[in-house]
């Protein structure tokens, strides 16, 4: 080595040691998604919501409030809004099934309706208008130990002969012994028995998540405004409508039942652990200091943030947004430079790494006026519930 090189060696040694001791930067910390200022993201999210609300209501501009009557909202309108809000809250509380669970074969179980000598039936007035069907949730949990394992639930009823056309409605027992409408069916006259099936997957997931012991449904004749006869004409196996309002004794194994399709119990632990690893939802993100992709809190006050006074309920809501880097799954020594170069050539404005985007969104019920008429509307996909890298 020339003398000049020897003189430089003491200066080069610290640099060489620094290169040796410093680990190569893993690709897991890299993302080609541009880093955006948090306040800028919030402002953009607010402006996006402004446009979304007007677009979903098909309004070119906020409606005039000149004709809005003074005072509080009418009680009927407020009751409709509250019931809509409660229904949305109940549905959003339901656990989401995991895509991985759809791969596995489903175990099918039948849970029969509770027999009518159970005291639960004494709490409901016997009527020619309706029949009641209650189920023991302990039997449901024995068949499906975790709500996330439930793939599908059907309420099956064996309809007997029907002489006249009958419009029926199915309701779910709700809080304070109230009833929530689920669906309806128009039954044609028939001389032969026929199985009726109602999809009640969401309802059964709610039951599995709650601590109640007995839950139930009500099948009722449709109440027509121009008809005085609201008698339930259809006979369901296991009941006799009685025409006198009497609930007859249940008979046979073909009484109403729930057909449950669920992923087997032995896979529950695997799916549950996978769910915790993947769930970038509000429960996880709001209680952690996660720096990567996650749901970020954002409350929008309609008056303060949007300058709007025309939305009367709610006054604001938690819109939230997704933010955070989505790491590469490759390491630096396994990246295919030619593939990435070709990708960037054909997609110069795109990211070579996934970006943080919404996965689950919830609706937002609102009350607003059009002229002097109050309206209750449900705006879809307004609340970010969870995020994913995509």
From Swiss-Prot:
<feature type="disulfide bond">
    <location>
        <begin position="285"/>
        <end position="294"/>
    </location>
</feature>
<dbReference type="GO" id="GO:0030308">
    <property type="term" value="P:negative regulation of cell growth"/>
</dbReference>
<dbReference type="GO" id="GO:0034714">
    <property type="term" value="F:type III transforming growth factor beta receptor binding"/>
</dbReference>
<dbReference type="GO" id="GO:0032740">
    <property type="term" value="P:positive regulation of interleukin-17 production"/>
</dbReference>
<feature type="region of interest" description="Arm domain">
    <location>
        <begin position="75"/>
        <end position="271"/>
    </location>
</feature>
<dbReference type="GO" id="GO:0030335">
    <property type="term" value="P:positive regulation of cell migration"/>
</dbReference>
<dbReference type="GO" id="GO:0048298">
    <property type="term" value="P:positive regulation of isotype switching to IgA isotypes"/>
</dbReference>
<dbReference type="GO" id="GO:0009611">
    <property type="term" value="P:response to wounding"/>
</dbReference>
<dbReference type="GO" id="GO:0010628">
    <property type="term" value="P:positive regulation of gene expression"/>
</dbReference>
<dbReference type="GO" id="GO:0010718">
    <property type="term" value="P:positive regulation of epithelial to mesenchymal transition"/>
</dbReference>
<dbReference type="GO" id="GO:0045892">
    <property type="term" value="P:negative regulation of DNA-templated transcription"/>
</dbReference>
<dbReference type="GO" id="GO:0051781">
    <property type="term" value="P:positive regulation of cell division"/>
</dbReference>
<keyword id="KW-0964">Secreted</keyword>
<dbReference type="InterPro" id="IPR001839">
    <property type="entry name" value="TGF-b_C"/>
</dbReference>
<dbReference type="GO" id="GO:0060391">
    <property type="term" value="P:positive regulation of SMAD protein signal transduction"/>
</dbReference>
<dbReference type="GO" id="GO:0010763">
    <property type="term" value="P:positive regulation of fibroblast migration"/>
</dbReference>
<dbReference type="GO" id="GO:0072562">
    <property type="term" value="C:blood microparticle"/>
</dbReference>
<dbReference type="GO" id="GO:0050921">
    <property type="term" value="P:positive regulation of chemotaxis"/>
</dbReference>
<dbReference type="GO" id="GO:0014008">
    <property type="term" value="P:positive regulation of microglia differentiation"/>
</dbReference>
<dbReference type="GO" id="GO:0045662">
    <property type="term" value="P:negative regulation of myoblast differentiation"/>
</dbReference>
<dbReference type="GO" id="GO:0010936">
    <property type="term" value="P:negative regulation of macrophage cytokine production"/>
</dbReference>
<dbReference type="GO" id="GO:0070723">
    <property type="term" value="P:response to cholesterol"/>
</dbReference>
<dbReference type="GO" id="GO:0001837">
    <property type="term" value="P:epithelial to mesenchymal transition"/>
</dbReference>
<feature type="disulfide bond">
    <location>
        <begin position="293"/>
        <end position="356"/>
    </location>
</feature>
<dbReference type="GO" id="GO:0005737">
    <property type="term" value="C:cytoplasm"/>
</dbReference>
<dbReference type="GO" id="GO:0070374">
    <property type="term" value="P:positive regulation of ERK1 and ERK2 cascade"/>
</dbReference>
<dbReference type="GO" id="GO:0010629">
    <property type="term" value="P:negative regulation of gene expression"/>
</dbReference>
<feature type="region of interest" description="Bowtie tail">
    <location>
        <begin position="226"/>
        <end position="252"/>
    </location>
</feature>
<dbReference type="GO" id="GO:0045216">
    <property type="term" value="P:cell-cell junction organization"/>
</dbReference>
<feature type="glycosylation site" description="N-linked (GlcNAc...) asparagine">
    <location>
        <position position="82"/>
    </location>
</feature>
<dbReference type="GO" id="GO:0006796">
    <property type="term" value="P:phosphate-containing compound metabolic process"/>
</dbReference>
<dbReference type="GO" id="GO:0097191">
    <property type="term" value="P:extrinsic apoptotic signaling pathway"/>
</dbReference>
<dbReference type="GO" id="GO:0032801">
    <property type="term" value="P:receptor catabolic process"/>
</dbReference>
<feature type="site" description="Cleavage; by FURIN">
    <location>
        <begin position="278"/>
        <end position="279"/>
    </location>
</feature>
<dbReference type="GO" id="GO:0043537">
    <property type="term" value="P:negative regulation of blood vessel endothelial cell migration"/>
</dbReference>
<dbReference type="GO" id="GO:0045742">
    <property type="term" value="P:positive regulation of epidermal growth factor receptor signaling pathway"/>
</dbReference>
<dbReference type="GO" id="GO:0009986">
    <property type="term" value="C:cell surface"/>
</dbReference>
<dbReference type="GO" id="GO:0007435">
    <property type="term" value="P:salivary gland morphogenesis"/>
</dbReference>
<dbReference type="GO" id="GO:0005114">
    <property type="term" value="F:type II transforming growth factor beta receptor binding"/>
</dbReference>
<dbReference type="GO" id="GO:0002244">
    <property type="term" value="P:hematopoietic progenitor cell differentiation"/>
</dbReference>
<dbReference type="GO" id="GO:1900126">
    <property type="term" value="P:negative regulation of hyaluronan biosynthetic process"/>
</dbReference>
<dbReference type="InterPro" id="IPR029034">
    <property type="entry name" value="Cystine-knot_cytokine"/>
</dbReference>
């Amino acid at each position: 080595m020339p003398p000049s090189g020897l003189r430089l060696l003491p200066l080069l040694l610290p640099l060489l040691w620094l290169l040796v001791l410093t680990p190569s930067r893993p690709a897991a910390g890299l993302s080609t998604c541009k880093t955006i200022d948090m306040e800028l993201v919030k402002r953009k999210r607010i402006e996006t919501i402004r446009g979304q609300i007007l677009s979903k209501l098909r309004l070119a501009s906020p409606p005039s409030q000149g004709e809005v009557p003074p005072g509080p909202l009418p009680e009927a309108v407020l009751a409709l809004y509250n019931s809509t809000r409660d229904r949305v809250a109940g549905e959003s509380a339901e656990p989401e099934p995991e895509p991985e669970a759809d791969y596995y074969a489903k175990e099918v179980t039948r849970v029969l309706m509770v027999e009518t000598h159970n005291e639960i039936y004494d709490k409901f007035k016997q009527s020619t208008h309706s029949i009641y069907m209650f189920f023991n949730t302990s039997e449901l949990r024995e068949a499906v130990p975790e709500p996330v394992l439930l793939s599908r639930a059907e309420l099956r009823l064996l309809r007997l002969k029907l002489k006249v056309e009958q419009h029926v409605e199915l309701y779910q027992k709700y809080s304070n012994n109230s009833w929530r409408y689920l669906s309806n069916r128009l039954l044609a006259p028939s001389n032969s028995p026929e199985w009726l099936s109602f999809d009640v997957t969401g309802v059964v997931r709610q039951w599995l998540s709650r601590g109640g012991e007995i839950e139930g449904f009500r099948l009722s004749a449709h109440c027509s405004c121009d008809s005085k006869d609201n008698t339930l004409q259809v006979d369901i196996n296991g009941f006799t409508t009685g025409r006198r309002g009497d609930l007859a004794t249940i008979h046979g194994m073909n009484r109403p039942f729930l057909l449950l399709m669920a992923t087997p119990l032995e896979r529950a632990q695997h799916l549950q652990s996978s769910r915790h690893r993947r769930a970038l939802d509000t429960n996880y993100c709001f209680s952690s200091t996660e720096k990567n992709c996650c749901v970020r809190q954002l409350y929008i006050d309609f008056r303060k943030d949007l300058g709007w006074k025309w939305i009367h309920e709610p006054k604001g809501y938690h819109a939230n947004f997704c933010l955070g880097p989505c790491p590469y799954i490759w390491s630096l020594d396994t990246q295919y430079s030619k593939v990435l170069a070709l990708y960037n050539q054909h997609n110069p404005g795109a990211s070579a790494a996934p970006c943080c985007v919404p996965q689950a969104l919830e609706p937002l019920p609102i009350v607003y006026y059009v002229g002097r008429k109050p309206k209750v509307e449900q705006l879809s996909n307004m609340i970010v519930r969870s995020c994913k890298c995509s």
